[in-house]
């Protein structure tokens, strides 16, 4: 779980977080899940020639976050296969659910071709789920 401060630049004219900015917060949550392990994204690319890209996203905006709020992004890897990672993510303020999202990520190589996770990477990802 990581905490994020909402800055003025994140908000719309009403002082609420602009809807597209929640996607940035979700991305940070998924990245931080990787960073808490033994790799980062650049190391994954160098070692495995792999990049993770979003294939689909389902997001429910339940309540707004506002300028200067401190929000938390909770991320869990719910389903892992050789060609797909399914994340459940929540954005919370003071134990109140603001956003609930399901994000499906797929592995591609530097040419943009979908690839399968090898055994080492699959086992590693199983440890963070």
Where are these regions (language model features)?
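Hot-dog-fold acyl-thioester-processing enzymes
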Residues: 1-54, 109-129
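Active-site beta-strand->loop segment that positions catalytic residues and contacts the acyl thioester
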Residues: 55-70, 76-82
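Generic structural detector for well-ordered beta-strands
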Residues: 3-7, 58-60, 104
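Alpha-helix boundary/capping detector
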Residues: 48-52, 59-60, 101
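Acidic-enriched, low-complexity/disordered segments with a strong bias for Aspartate over Glutamate
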Residues: 10-12, 69, 100
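Short amphipathic alpha-helical "recognition" segments used for binding
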Residues: 28-31, 59, 93
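HotDog/MaoC-like acyl-thioester-processing domains
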Residues: 2, 35, 66-67, 78-129
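Short, positively charged
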Residues: 43, 49-50, 68-70, 86-88
């Amino acid at each position: 779980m990581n905490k994020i401060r909402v800055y003025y630049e994140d908000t719309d004219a009403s002082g609420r977080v602009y809807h597209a900015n929640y996607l940035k917060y979700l991305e940070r949550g998924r990245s931080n899940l990787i960073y808490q392990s033994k790799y980062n994204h650049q190391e994954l690319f160098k070692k495995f020639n792999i990049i993770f890209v979003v294939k689909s996203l389902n997001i429910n905006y339940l309540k707004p976050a506002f300028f200067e709020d401190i929000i938390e992004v909770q991320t869990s890897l719910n389903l892992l296969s050789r060609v797909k990672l399914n994340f459940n993510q929540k954005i919370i303020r003071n134990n109140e659910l603001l956003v609930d999202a399901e994000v499906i990520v797929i592995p591609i190589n530097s040419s943009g071709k979908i690839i399968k996770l090898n055994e080492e990477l699959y086992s590693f990802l199983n440890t963070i789920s």
